[in-house]
Amino acid sequence: MRGLPNFYHSYTFFFFFLLILFPAYSISANTLSASESLTISSNNTIVSPGNVFELGFFKPGLDSRWYLGIWYKAISKRTYVWVANRDTPLSSSIGTLKISDSNLVVLDQSDTPVWSTNLTGGDVRSPLVAELLDNGNFVLRDSKNSAPDGVLWQSFDFPTDTLLPEMKLGWDAKTGFNRFIRSWKSPDDPSSGDFSFKLETEGFPEIFLWNRESRMYRSGPWNGIRFSGVPEMQPFEYMVFNFTTSKEEVTYSFRITKSDVYSRLSISSSGLLQRFTWIETAQNWNQFWYAPKDQCDEYKECGVYGYCDSNTSPVCNCIKGFKPRNPQVWGLRDGSDGCVRKTLLSCGGGDGFVRLKKMKLPDTTTASVDRGIGVKECEQKCLRDCNCTAFANTDIRGSGSGCVTWTGELFDIRNYAKGGQDLYVRLAATDLEDKRNRSAKIIGSSIGVSVLLLLSFIIFFLWKRKQKRSILIETPIVDHQLRSRDLLMNEVVISSRRHISRENNTDDLELPLMEFEEVAMATNNFSNANKLGQGGFGIVYKGKLLDGQEMAVKRLSKTSVQGTDEFKNEVKLIARLQHINLVRLLACCVDAGEKMLIYEYLENLSLDSHLFDKSRNSKLNWQMRFDIINGIARGLLYLHQDSRFRIIHRDLKASNILLDKYMTPKISDFGMARIFGRDETEANTRKVVGTYGYMSPEYAMDGIFSMKSDVFSFGVLLLEIISSKRNKGFYNSDRDLNLLGCVWRNWKEGKGLEIIDPIITDSSSTFRQHEILRCIQIGLLCVQERAEDRPTMSLVILMLGSESTTIPQPKAPGYCLERSLLDTDSSSSKQRDDESWTVNQITVSVLDAR
């Protein structure tokens, strides 16, 4: 027994030795006391009780700057949800978090505070403690009071780019905070970016997505179930949404009812609002929802008194009783000028309301709310106010309750196929549907004659309407000229009028038809001074109408490889498509033996004119290129997934990407595009069309094309944007490889950055090495030889926009060393077993290269 004290003495000494040797374990699991500190060098962290979240220092990507932040510990992919010193990073690996003078502070190498909770005043008697809670909230509180009233400061009051469950977005009267989320500057730069998501408390509260000082997207007000502008926001088994409006707070939040489900709402550095859920089996974040989704989500897309409907073409429509403010511009598919009343209101003169169903309510920042009355009382209230222009229920649950009224103009309205709610817009008596019924009552004793006249009017009206819908402008048949009816196969209704009537069925489409003389005048008789470019199809000219409207005229040459079929195809497809990243077709011309397409004029012409011109590509810094990549990806996703049709472009290349004055990319040239059914995944053709260097192997060799063919072309384009080198015609003096081969070789050798355009590295303010390497990796994934290995465009966008998304390692690309075109009459070829064929060594029945 005499040796027992010596054993305990030795054990105690060993225990204290371990504490000295491993200081990382000197801090409690989820708290930091006033006597403790967190340092970068010790690699200490604080972990929430349920091991879901972790707080510590980190540096993103390959940067040398350090930040204090919170991330998910329970999942395999490092995902940051909060950053303390996002705009004041530590410049070296020396940094400390501690409690000092009743504040949490982050100190740099000289013990100078770079971040603090900035609490002032108050009588703090007991010691303070910092604690990381189970929900990811980092709090500073009284060490003797763990109740909510003991909290002096919390990270949930200062969000960065992520809204977590139980975190509140919006205004709190007690603290005076209006909490909002703001994007990172880039995927590997946590500093404050350009985009923010804020709750507007004025009028009928709603949330806006901002790009600096400009509104981009609006959620619509909360209608008791969901936001008016988010119809897909349905109740879920494990997710509960909450919107609170009271004197104490106006906030939005959500909570998760299952502890093993992780979800977050975040805003990407490119301005995309996204909800993610963690998929354990895939070990990845799944994009559950995102906004803006389409052109109709763009703020004020159709101006005042106009509404947007993605299922009509054009997407902009005037509310019943209104007409386009500028018919000519409206006819050219620019709805920003909005609409005006056909008949002015007459207060007390029989005004009424037209009921619009399944609508996103107009902007409500200046609207008035009365939650104590119903829809009938709301209607009377609006009628009594001569300035009232519309009303709706504030709560759509049950039979509806509450009242919101608008005075002044109505804007940012859209119609949904499902969801939305009823909106009642005030009209003059003469514009109401039941005007004929009221007239019949006034006639009284002459009802018989009135009915006869009324029936005659209806018959005449219907006859005129039928005539209007069936009219097609037919041009004389001169030589090989085709009638416009035959040309467009009755799928596009051609109108000679600039104003497009909205009386036609939404399945039809009216496209303005311009006369040859009008186009010739607009282009100064197709002068060389107006020439913008030239291709296998013909020449593109700049034109200007008498009202100053600029346009681009694509004039097909008589010998164009883009023949009548391609012309019809382009008109049918692009006339029905509406997206910010697709070029807009304004009109067409089939006259005097000519075929011409009239597009919106884009000031910065095509991407290739900037990318491959050394005198012009100097302004293409990395941020601009990254935005162009994202825009092209969104446009392609719209074609593949989000449009009314599933469309394969088949000719995606740099010269078919046009740039507007803001350098927003727009996909053009749909002459080779094909429509797929929703259940179709691929098709086969004996006529291979497209451009060498952009065609996928399976398409070039076997005529098989699918969405993955476009993905391949996108991958080539992405790598061209990064390198400013063409895939076709690329030459490397050391090895006879095309661009894809060069990128692949450098990637395997760990020299991925060597292919970057030096212009990018010179613009140090926007050069983000880690982000560029991710893009190169994504590009290589897109150009993999086997179509099934390539990602979908939805996954591409997810990988581009989310730093937390895992990117797999790419396999070898499908690329070529030389071109060998064989007899075009042959449909197959033989090769020896020892021959190594490449993508461009192909045999096809008919080959059209442009």
Swiss-Prot record:
Q: GO terms for molecular function, please?
A: ATP binding; carbohydrate binding; protein serine kinase activity; transmembrane receptor protein serine/threonine kinase activity; ubiquitin protein ligase binding
Map out region (CaM-binding) in residue numbers: 615-632
The residues on the Extracellular side of the membrane are 27-441
Q: Where, by residue number, does the polypeptide cross the bilayer?
A: 442-462
* Gene3D superfamilies in UniProt: Bulb-type lectin domain, Phosphorylase Kinase, domain 1, Transferase(Phosphotransferase) domain 1
The residues responsible for catalysis, as annotated, are 651
> Which effect does the record note for changing residue 384 to K?
In strain: cv. Ag-0, cv. An-1, cv. Bay-0, cv. Bil-5, cv. Bil-7, cv. Bor-1, cv. Br-0, cv. Bur-0, cv. C24, cv. CIBC-17, cv. Ct-1, cv. Ed-1, cv. Edi-0, cv. Fab-4, cv. Fei-0, cv. Ga-0, cv. Ge-0, cv. Goettingen-22, cv. Goettingen-7, cv
Q: Indicate what this protein is called per its UniProt record.
A: Receptor-like serine/threonine-protein kinase SD1-8
The protein's gene is named: SD18
